[in-house]
Amino acid sequence: MNALKHCASIDLEDWYNDVECVVPRDSRAFSQAFDRQLNRIQSIFDEAGVRCTFFALGRTAERYPAWIKRLHAEGHEIATHGYGHARITTLDPVSFRADVRRSLEVVADLIGARPQGYRAPYFSLGRGEMWAYEILAGEGLRYSSSVFPFPGRNYGIGDHPTSPLRVATPSGTLVEMPLSVVDLAGRRLPVAGGGFWRATHRLAIRLAASRIAREGRSFVMYLHPHEFDPEPLHSHNGFARNLYVNLGRVSIADKLRYMFKRFAFVPVSSVVAGLGSIPERFIANSGGHV
């Protein structure tokens, strides 16, 4: 097993938040599905002796407080995914600060400590949202893991550094831990989780992580609870959307077990705490003061 530590993370939310589906609001069915998904995730992590970062959506934490307390008590890091799962691109600085602050308060009330980390919904911290860093720093956050350094259609920054970056703002400093990508024939390929993990063979994930490790970088992975659900998920958005949300989910648990046997995974905050000297970028006030 490589001595380099890698980042394990789960974006903790109900599945319709992730895939933007219209779904029937049967609260009992949702609770049963969430319990089923989290029990499976917990079993995999316990089996491997791995602890990870759960980026908890604020309203999800409100809905399932027992799970937040349980995961925290078992040694997992509870970070924030914002409160309402709104893209930063749809928020102004005032609304963004309110969303982040509300999520921090919800989690702090449940675990007795304020989260250290933040992940933007839909990885929506893009080139036009650099002002968000000053707000995150001002709220006391130590790191963000929000940037996908590839030119995606709806998110991503194609020329963003692929290694951790220290971001200095007038309100404080924090670290950006970008999601993992690899260069393939001159183009960046997102390999951190989601569709790539569901659609590709586990060997492809291993090769990507090994390549990143050889470059001296930690592999930053992410998954969602619904990707561990053995039961089919259905929305009102038609056949194509249902096909997408169910694609490859049956293989995710085995792929994660496979990766845990070959790489050392820890919470994101543990990797951040061990960073030495890394590049720094100053973000001047660009409208982030509220």
Where are these regions (language model features)?
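Active-site-adjacent pocket scaffolds in enzyme catalytic domains
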Residues: 18, 113-116, 120-217, 221, ...
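C-terminal domain-boundary segment and adjacent tail
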Residues: 47-48, 199-290
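Active-site beta->alpha N-cap acidic-glycine motif
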Residues: 1-74
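Metal-dependent polysaccharide deacetylase catalytic core of the NodB/CE4 family, i.e.
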Residues: 48-129, 141, 146-153, 171-173, ...
